A protein has these predicted regions:
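Face-selective signature of the C-terminal outer-membrane beta-barrel domain
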Residues: 243-262, 283-422, 434, 495-501, ...
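Membrane-embedded beta-barrel scaffold of Gram-negative outer-membrane proteins
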Residues: 297-318, 436, 444, 472-531, ...
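Gram-negative outer-membrane beta-barrel transporters
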Residues: 402-407, 494-505, 524-611, 643
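Short acidic/polar hinge/loop motifs at secondary-structure boundaries
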Residues: 104-132
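N-terminal periplasmic "start-of-domain" segments of outer-membrane beta-barrel proteins
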Residues: 31-59, 86, 94, 127
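Periplasmic-side early beta-strands and strand-to-turn transitions of outer-membrane beta-barrels
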Residues: 158, 181-281
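N-terminal periplasmic accessory domains that precede
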Residues: 64-67, 85-88, 100, 114-117, ...
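Extracytoplasmic beta-strand/coil segments of soluble accessory domains associated
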Residues: 65-105
Length: 685
């Protein structure tokens, strides 16, 4: 173990040495190193993490799950490459994370969560995290927080195009194309991403052992076999069309249309001894999201209207070959989701010290879920699932007051309705104070109550749904300090960071438990106390003319403990850390750039996670901690007709053998090469 760690350190030092010897390119300008003490009034007391465009546009193969893994300290739970990836803040569950795209909530209404592996980072222009109480400014239900994703209307003037081709390990192919047109009034953008791979990476299967025999058939040893990821192929297609029109009189109109077509096999578990040719385990999805928007900006009054529609068709098919040539369908699950969306936002600035906001959001869901393979003995079809509709309304009002040049106060009142059930009023209070202009030292604090209604599966899924479930609710407290400073002379640099304490008490936590009838059913059983620290540090400096070093790090300590009553004398979950919640998580990104070269190092860490509520420290009861390192080297070339971008990415640099989810192996070291072509339509040759 010691030699292994030394080996990794030596390789890392060699990489850093090589990077210092290789020129690297800089997209960041000196102006980004200048820090001012002014912060927007809309962010009074808000705990927010914002991702820059370099992280989002690093390479076309990245999903938002990858960006969040290496760019923040939230927990990303991944079932493998190109499989379900969910996000959880502050020791909560994925359903406690709300996700919006251009203001429209995109959480799956059946499950209550979002699969971030299906969101290409190249389709996102703005991304930020609102931690804890700060999510109440946007929506209710975010007991952990909110992920805000969006696109922007600004494109370069004239006709512009970009094409990127990626070729990687495991016969992986990634393609991206974008075509834009812009003038004083119109902004038009079309983006396309296509990714495919057999995804048959090799791994060491620690859940199996192969015995070694001598000539007398006595066992003299054993080893863990090397296997390939079986049934893991995928094909993902994404198309994003945007049209914006600026009337130049304060009115702006927009259209966003996003289509996703996904065809993915579900990989076999490491404990499965079957032959992948004997079965099919496949999930398909077709999703369309569309938004029409109108924004009106005046001197003191601004408002916006949005209307949207989401359609999702999902299919899960599982079949096995019982005898040679005789394949039997076991499951043919089909789900259809239709969601209609409407939103109004208004902002009034009567003076420089006051901002008032009013918001109203509506989501109408229609969901049909069934298994077409279930047949009763009489021959009639039996629906396993449900066919339900639910209206979800959320209204909010806020007042933000800049009491003095140093002190800001904010209050938010929110009211939510799901179906015919109204939640108690959700209050939230925020405050911040500028302690020192030197260093821009800011103190922030907030408190809020929040509610999370059960998902449609929780209430109506057959068999097991529980329509009598109560909403989860709790109080969250935040307090933190941050600083930002910098200079342009004599050595240009900027340094920023922050530390936040949070404390959350959530009652009536929903969990699915086994019943005497042979299936699982959800119940309100837990009271959870989640608390801890979140820290961040950003450093950027120019050691010499044209050089830039940029470091960004984050860390979270998140104990999340079950404080409820014992369900039975044998219940050992009380007082224990929740399953699949790491106590420690961290990330680090370092960029070295000079002229047209760029070297990037990314690192992520998760501490051990328990797989059972009793926190049993057994072979299958916990997952070891793991460290992940990725690097990339990029070169930009400029010619008269086109610009070229060349990039080599190395993922899992140290060939870490790890699991994010029990019995779900992850790939070892792998490579991908990208070439980008940008024609110069509008530039002088």
């Amino acid at each position: 173990m010691f030699m292994n760690k030394c080996y990794k350190v030596i390789i890392l030092l060699c990489i850093v040495h090589c990077a210092l010897c290789i020129p690297a390119w800089s997209q960041k300008q000196l102006r980004e190193l200048v820090v001012t003490a002014k912060r927007p009034m809309k962010d009074i007391g808000v705990q927010k993490t914002t991702f820059d465009s370099l992280a989002l546009k690093e390479n076309i193969a990245l999903s938002m799950a990858d960006v969040l893994t290496f760019g923040s300290s939230v927990y990303v739970k991944s079932y493998g490459r190109a499989t379900l990836s969910t996000i959880a803040f502050r020791g909560t569950s994925p359903s406690h994370t709300q996700v919006t795209w251009n203001g429209m909530r995109i959480n799956n209404p059946m499950l209550g969560m979002t699969d971030f592996s299906t969101i290409p980072a190249y389709f996102i222009d703005r991304a930020s995290l609102l931690h804890g109480t700060s999510s109440v400014n946007e929506t209710g239900g975010g007991l952990g927080g909110l992920v805000s994703l969006g696109t922007v209307a600004d494109v370069d003037s004239g006709l512009n195009a970009q094409y990127v081709q990626g070729i990687g390990s495991f016969s992986t192919f990634d393609e991206f194309a974008r075509l834009t047109y812009g003038d004083d009034r119109w902004s038009v953008s079309t983006r396309v991403v296509y990714s495919s791979s057999p995804n048959d990476y090799r791994y060491t299967n620690h859940d199996k052992k192969v015995n070694i025999y001598d000539d007398d058939h006595n066992i003299i040893g054993s080893y863990h076999p090397r296997e390939r990821n079986r049934s893991g192929a995928f094909r993902d297609f994404h198309l994003l069309q945007e049209v914006y029109y600026n009337a130049l009189n304060g009115n702006r109109f927009g259209l966003n249309a996003w289509y996703t077509g996904s065809n993915r096999e579900l990989p076999m578990l490491t404990t499965d001894y079957g032959d992948e040719r004997d079965f099919e385990n496949r999930q398909r999805e077709n999703t369309f999201r569309g938004i029409l928007s109108w924004d009106r900006s005046g001197e003191k009054l601004r408002f916006g209207l949005r209307g949207g529609y989401v359609h999702t068709w999902m299919a899960y098919d599982y079949s096995r070959e019982i005898t040679e040539g005789n394949r039997v369908n076991m499951t043919r699950s089909r789900s259809r989701i239709n969601t209609f969306f409407g939103r109004f936002d208004g902002t009034y600035n009567p003076s420089k010290r006051w901002i008032f906001t009013l918001g109203l959001t509506a989501h109408q869901h229609f969901v049909r879920s069934e298994d077409k393979q279930i047949i009763l003995q009489e021959g009639d079809k039996d629906i396993v699932g449900y066919d339900k509709g639910r209206i979800e309304l959320s209204a909010s009002a806020s007042a933000k007051w800049q009491a003095t040049d140093r002190i800001g106060l904010s209050a938010v009142i929110r009211e939510d309705m799901f179906g015919d059930s109204w939640a108690p009023v959700i209050p939230a209070f925020f405050a911040d104070a500028l302690l020192s202009r030197a260093g821009n030292i800011m103190l922030r604090a907030s408190v809020s109550k929040n509610h999370k209604f059960p998902s449609l599966n929780d209430m109506y899924f057959l068999p097991g749904g529980n329509p009598d479930l109560r909403s989860e609710d709790g109080w969250t407290y935040d307090a933190g300090i941050s600083f930002d400073t910098g200079s342009t002379k004599p050595l240009p640099f900027s340094v920023g960071g922050g530390l936040t304490w949070f404390d959350s008490h959530i009652s009536d936590w929903i969990i699915w438990l086994p019943t005497t009838k042979g299936f699982f059913s959800p119940r309100n059983v837990k009271d959870v106390h989640s608390y801890g620290l979140e820290g961040r540090l950003n450093v950027a400096f120019e050691p010499a003319r044209g050089w830039l070093v940029d470091l960004n790090g984050s860390y979270s300590w998140t104990p999340s403990v079950n404080r409820g009553e014992k369900m039975s004398p044998a219940d050992q979950s009380v007082g224990r850390q929740l399953p699949y919640v790491p106590r420690h998580s961290a990330s680090l990104t370092g960029r070295l750039s000079w002229r047209s070269w760029s070297f990037l190092y990314k690192w992520a860490y998760y501490s051990e996670r328990y797989t059972m509520s009793s926190n049993d420290y057994t072979l299958t009861g916990h997952l070891p901690e793991y460290f992940m390192s990725n690097i990339s080297l990029e070169k930009n070339l400029s010619f008269r007709p086109v610009d070229l971008q060349l990039k080599l990415a190395v993922n899992n640099l140290f060939n870490e053998d790890y699991l994010s989810v029990l019995s779900r192996p992850m790939p070892g070291i792998n490579f991908e090469f990208f070439i980008g072509i940008t024609p110069k339509f509008n530039r002088k040759k």
